[in-house]
Structures are given as structure tokens and as C-alpha cells.
């Protein structure tokens, strides 16, 4: 089987299938927006968040699920967080303000990122947020700001031992210095515990480092009297965009000839993984470290588990629609040009490719159903403005007025690298809900 005809079909939620098959819905939105747009479904996000929270309850582990806000800027997600008593992870003043404006309380906000601004630290202090301290100089600024505002709740971010070259986290020497300094500044700083973030999506390293931090919490309580009642294991919760067989076949048959201009890629996101989402959290908690499950260690030590999923909370919760502006044949394959830019499909700007297969929604008069392979380009003047280099097998030649639907794009794809290049408007986010089997839609609120 040729790679170009392989399915790589996305695993879709029922709402997404129904929405892309609802021609009247897409037609109404397309005529209103007159350009590319994103559909977001808060109900799917809420289901994902509830699943993570359910794992914590069923394992009898105290904890909080912080939505990694950087994964998508829509306000709709924040309203669901507030409804479900969740929390939000932010890394800038605008993210913090946006979160508060959508009903999430300050004490339910976690502040991460490197070298936070004074304004961000001040907001965190005023609103009772928890701050992950990443460096000694940041700690000094936090102490000074808390002295003028309110005592600051902090987690000390630990440099993972197996990632010594990471630019994030306190090495052992700095961690010891930070603890001593916090001991001197207990009027300004409350050490709630420790945090880390690991690259990749493996279960075992997260469980092992979490267990190490549980022991560190116990030692620090004894030595300094800090509460040390929580650890954060960060994000990196896996998703499965396509079925295992499709992903395996794709990798085995990968060849530059299947891409426009024989484009080659060094790596792809792992589009099929297991376990994923809340099941991965359950696997982490069930992992035996030493002679005891991590969940048991947390319970015995009375340490809460914080986590910061982004992509995993957005899995299945959005899709992106690009109107077709034109189609032409180029040698043995065609080029579809869509309204919009590849910056609205962010994976393309990581020297990679978003692989779940885009789908053609045919509009207008009937046409011959003669299959054609085509790559998909944006409407800019740049040769490399390409949304899909892979030659997709379409059931018919796309034409002006059709729509191209990219599935499952809510996690990082929609707005991570968006740009108003050529003064083109950014694709708006459209919130869709189903009531009595019919869709309603509205613009996402700022």
C-alpha cells in the first residue's frame, strides 16, 4: 500500500464527526466568518478534566488538575475549569488576567515558566496563587514582592537528575540554598512542596521522580517545618491521534516521495501512544517504586499530587476548517491553496507535519468523483507556507468554496504560532454545543 493512500484517520469524538458532516452548520459558519475558523467543544474538554479528577478520587489521592493554558487560548475551557473546581497553569500576566476574568479563583492558579516578571509575581501574591520557583534570583524577587503584598505560596522546581542540561529547575546545590533562604523568609514565603517537568511521555520516570519528591517533602518538613504538602509532576500526558496500525504502517513505509517536493522530516509527534490521558495518570499512580505504589506513598505521606495536562485535556475537543481558494495540478499531484496560513496549524512550524488526515467537505454542484492526490498550501507568498506536505488522497479534486477540515487540533495546533501575516485576520474560535441533537454555535469570548 502506498503511503499517500494510507488512512491515518483521526480518532474522533462523536460531536466532531457530527459537526463535520453537518453541511448546513459548516456552511453557515463559513459564510459568516469568510475565512478559516476553529471549532471548539467545551463538553469534550469537561469530560477529559473529569476523567483526570476521577482517577485521583478512585485512587484516594488528594490532588489538583491544572489546565496548561498555553495549549489553547480559548476562554471556553476556563469556564469549564471553574465549573468543575479545577485549576489553571499560567506563565504570563495576560494568561493570569484572562483566567481570573473567566471565573477561576486566584488560589486555583499555578504560575510556572522561567524568570517570571515582577508583575506576574505580584499578581500571584495578591491572588493567592502557587508559584513554581525556578532560580535563586527569582526567589529573591519573590520574597521582596511578597513583603509588599501577601505571603507567597511556592513550589521549588527541581532539576531532573536525568536532564542535567535542562534550563529549568534548581540543581541540588541551588535547591539547598533555596530551602535555607525560604527558612529565613517564612513571613513572606510558604513552601508547599516541589515540582518538576519531564520531556517525553513515559510513565516510569514520572513515578520515580515523584516518589523521590515525596521523600524530599518529608525530609523538608522535619528539617524546616514547612508544610511541604504537595508535589507537581507537570504535563506530558500522552494522546493517541490515530490507531496503532495506521501509525505503525506510516512509520514503516515513510518515504520522501510521498511528500510534496520530496520534503523529509527528522521527527514526528508520536501520533499513537498508550496509555493516554487519565489512563496514563492512573498508570503513574499504580507504578511500584521500591516496594510500594506511588499512590500509597502519597497517601501515607499526606502529600497531594498536582499535574498540568494541556494537550490531554484538549484531546478530541476541537477541529479547524480552512476554505479552499483554489486547486491546480503539479506533475503527478495537485496543490490545494486554502484561505489562511500554516501558522494556524502549529506543528508545521516545528519542522514537522500534522499527520492526522485532513478531510474534504465538498460544496456546490456535483462533480466527478475521481480521486486525486494533493498537498495543501496556505495563501501567503512564502514557498514554505504549507499546511500539509504529505500528498493526501482526496475523493475528488478540491475546488474554490470547498472546505478542508483538520481533526483534533485543539491541543497546541490552533494558536501556538498564529500570525496576522499579510494582515490576514486570525481564525476565530467558534464554540459549538449540541442541544437535542442539533448544534448551536457562538464566538468564543475574549
Q: Where are the regions that the model predicts?
A:
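Conserved anion-binding
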Residues: 135-190
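Non-cysteine beta-strand/loop elements that form the S-adenosyl-L-methionine
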Residues: 91-94, 112-116, 151-160, 191-196, ...
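Active-site-proximal loop/turn and secondary-structure-junction residues that shape catalytic pockets
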Residues: 71-73, 94-95, 115-117, 135-139, ...
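Conserved, mostly hydrophobic/aromatic
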Residues: 45, 70, 92, 124, ...
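A charged N-terminal "starter" segment
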Residues: 1-133, 139-144, 150-151, 186, ...
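General beta-strand structural signal in soluble alpha/beta enzymes
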Residues: 67, 88-91, 111, 132-135, ...
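C-terminal active-site-proximal or functional interface alpha/beta core segments in diverse enzymes
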Residues: 202-203, 208-446
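Conserved strand-turn element in the central/C-terminal portion of the radical SAM core barrel
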Residues: 128-132, 191-202
Amino acid at each position: 500500500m502506498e503511503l499517500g493512500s494510507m488512512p491515518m484517520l483521526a480518532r474522533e469524538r462523536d460531536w466532531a464527526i457530527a459537526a463535520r458532516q453537518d453541511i448546513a452548520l459548516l456552511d453557515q459558519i463559513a459564510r459568516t466568518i469568510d475565512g478559516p475558523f476553529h471549532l471548539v467543544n467545551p463538553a469534550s474538554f469537561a469530560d477529559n478534566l473529569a476523567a483526570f479528577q476521577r482517577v485521583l478520587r478512585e485512587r484516594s489521592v488528594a490532588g489538583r488538575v491544572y489546565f496548561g493554558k498555553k495549549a489553547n487560548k480559548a476562554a471556553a475551557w476556563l469556564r469549564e475549569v471553574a465549573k468543575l473546581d479545577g485549576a489553571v497553569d499560567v506563565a504570563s500576566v495576560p494568561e493570569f488576567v484572562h483566567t481570573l476574568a473567566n471565573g477561576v479563583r486566584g488560589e486555583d492558579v499555578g504560575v510556572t515558566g522561567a524568570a517570571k516578571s515582577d508583575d506576574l509575581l505580584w499578581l500571584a501574591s495578591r491572588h493567592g496563587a502557587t508559584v513554581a520557583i525556578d532560580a535563586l534570583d527569582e526567589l529573591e524577587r519573590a520574597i521582596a514582592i511578597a513583603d509588599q503584598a501577601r505571603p507567597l505560596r511556592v513550589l521549588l522546581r527541581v532539576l531532573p537528575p536525568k536532564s542535567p542540561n535542562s534550563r529549568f529547575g534548581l540543581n541540588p546545590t541551588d535547591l539547598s540554598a533555596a530551602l535555607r533562604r525560604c527558612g529565613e523568609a517564612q513571613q513572606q514565603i510558604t513552601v508547599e512542596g516541589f515540582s518538576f517537568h519531564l520531556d517525553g511521555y513515559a510513565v516510569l520516570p514520572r513515578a520515580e521522580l515523584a516518589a523521590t519528591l515525596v521523600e524530599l517533602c518529608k525530609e523538608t518538613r522535619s528539617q524546616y517545618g514547612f508544610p511541604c504538602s504537595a508535589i507537581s509532576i507537570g504535563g506530558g500526558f500522552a494522546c493517541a491521534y490515530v490507531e496503532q496500525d495506521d501509525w505503525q504502517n506510516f512509520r514503516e513505509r515513510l518515504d520522501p516521495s510521498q511528500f510534496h517536493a520530496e520534503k523529509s522530516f527528522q521527527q514526528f509527534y508520536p501520533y499513537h501512544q498508550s496509555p493516554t490521558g487519565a489512563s496514563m495518570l492512573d498508570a503513574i499512580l499504580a507504578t511500584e517504586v521500591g516496594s510500594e505504589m506511588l499512590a500509597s506513598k502519597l497517601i501515607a505521606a499526606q502529600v497531594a499530587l498536582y499535574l498540568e495536562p494541556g494537550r490531554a485535556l484538549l484531546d478530541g475537543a476541537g477541529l479547524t476548517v480552512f476554505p479552499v481558494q483554489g486547486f491546480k495540478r503539479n506533475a503527478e499531484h495537485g496543490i490545494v491553496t486554502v484561505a489562511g496560513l500554516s501558522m494556524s496549524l502549529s506543528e508545521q512550524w516545528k519542522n514537522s507535519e500534522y499527520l492526522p488526515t485532513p478531510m474534504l467537505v465538498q460544496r456546490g454542484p456535483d462533480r466527478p468523483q475521481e480521486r486525486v492526490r494533493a498537498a495543501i498550501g496556505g495563501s501567503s507568498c512564502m514557498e514554505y507556507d504549507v499546511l500539509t506536505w504529505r500528498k493526501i488522497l482526496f475523493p475528488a479534486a478540491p475546488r474554490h468554496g470547498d472546505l478542508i477540515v483538520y481533526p483534533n487540533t485543539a491541543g497546541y495546533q490552533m494558536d501556538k504560532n498564529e500570525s496576522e501575516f499579510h494582515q490576514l485576520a486570525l481564525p476565530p474560535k467558534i464554540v459549538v454545543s449540541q442541544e437535542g441533537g442539533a448544534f448551536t454555535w457562538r464566538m468564543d469570548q475574549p
